[in-house]
């Protein structure tokens, strides 16, 4: 599991390098095909996404919860496999969810026509993931009602 304690050692393995333009402790990675750069600012404990990635809220752009490291990793993987930054939305308000209300999902991905087609709800390894998976299997969580 990625945590505040081990992310610094993990990022170079994922292609991140010291930012030449920063006087702070920042590691960054440029995704050539996506034309995007994402960074991790250790001094301020935050994730920095390219401006083309829409962020409806900035709740998950810090180190405060283990799940936010998973969101960051997922965005990096989406860029790595060829999604454009403009296709990625962080924390959009989404209809549905629990008790027929709206909720904020972690990541929304749009297709090439800018139509939403994939929601990604991130969970960190361990109890959070296991608890949520049990809820899905029991039908208590209505992500699948959005289809």
Question: Positions of the model-derived regions?
Answer:
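A short, conserved, highly charged catalytic patch centered on acidic carboxylates
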Residues: 1-147
């Amino acid at each position: 599991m990625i945590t505040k304690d081990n992310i610094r050692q993990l990022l170079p393995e994922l292609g991140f390098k010291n930012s030449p333009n920063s006087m702070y402790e920042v590691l960054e990675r440029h995704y050539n095909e996506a034309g995007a750069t994402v960074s991790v600012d250790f001094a301020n404990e935050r994730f920095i996404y390219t401006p083309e990635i829409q962020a409806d809220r900035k709740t998950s752009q810090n180190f405060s919860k283990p799940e936010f490291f998973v969101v960051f990793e997922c965005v990096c993987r989406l860029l790595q496999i060829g999604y454009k930054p403009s296709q990625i939305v962080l924390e959009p308000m989404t209809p549905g969810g629990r008790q027929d209300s709206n909720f904020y999902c972690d990541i929304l991905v749009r297709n090439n026509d800018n139509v939403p087609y994939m929601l990604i709800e991130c969970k960190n390894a361990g109890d959070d993931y296991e608890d949520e998976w049990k809820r899905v299997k029991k039908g208590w969580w209505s992500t699948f009602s959005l289809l």
